[in-house]
A protein has these predicted regions:
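Short, solvent-exposed coil/turn elements at secondary-structure transition points
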Residues: 22, 37-38, 69, 89
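Short acidic, glycine/proline-enriched helix-loop-strand junctions
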Residues: 41-42, 71-89
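Short, solvent-exposed loop/turn elements at beta->coil junctions and helix N-caps
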Residues: 19, 67-72
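Short, well-ordered alpha-helical segments
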Residues: 27-68
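N-terminal presequence-like segments and the immediate start of the first folded domain
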Residues: 1-31, 86
């Protein structure tokens, strides 16, 4: 995306896929979840930064099977991401 990022974490290089296939030689580390306020491009970037930092803390080098949920209730607009953290060998 070409807009400014509002993420609170420094960027981390991480492979991200919506496909659930795990590459050969990789190990699954667990599921990671992040949720932030807002439903827009900035909230998506902020949420992705939070998700990659949580995965990185587990030792992950990639995320697979990523799912996006955007709740637009009047009183609680949120962007949430869920993915499986893996380590590529």
């Amino acid at each position: 995306m070409t807009h400014e990022t509002h993420a609170t974490h420094p960027p981390i290089q991480m492979s991200v896929s919506t496909l659930p296939d795990r590459p050969a030689g990789s190990s699954e580390l667990g599921v990671v979840y992040a949720s932030v306020e807002g439903v827009n491009d900035h909230s998506f970037d902020e949420c992705l930064a939070e998700l990659t930092h949580k995965a990185h803390a587990l030792g992950a080098t990639a995320l697979i099977g990523m799912q996006l949920v955007q709740s637009q209730f009047q009183w609680n607009q949120r962007t949430s991401l869920l993915a499986t953290a893996i380590k590529l060998e």
